Amino acid sequence: HKLPGRVGDTPLCGAGFYAHPQLGACGTTGVGEAILTHVLAFEALRRASERPGEAAIIAASLCAAASRHHNGAAVGLILVRPDGEVAIVHCSEHMSWALAIGDAAPDSGLRRDLSPGT
């Protein structure tokens, strides 16, 4: 349910999604205000580009910060770097996702595998 005139984060480049040839691509989901105020998709890609191999750690940290600053809001993202590194993280009990790379069998998930503090 959205208030009249409210625009969510999804259509806003940098918040709900972002793609760049040198940075990769990222899509977000969750409470729009938390995602918008942190420009989550862009920031996750920008920071992951500075520390290759650590995209999941960086994305998890950004999601946790966005969630904390908005009273535990549900926030999640899927990030893919140009080198193929993938990060799928969320600060919520559930976030459905699926991943298929090349000829490998697809993978998918719904629940967090880690405790909320990790």
Predicted regions located by residue number:
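N-terminal nucleophile
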Residues: 1-118
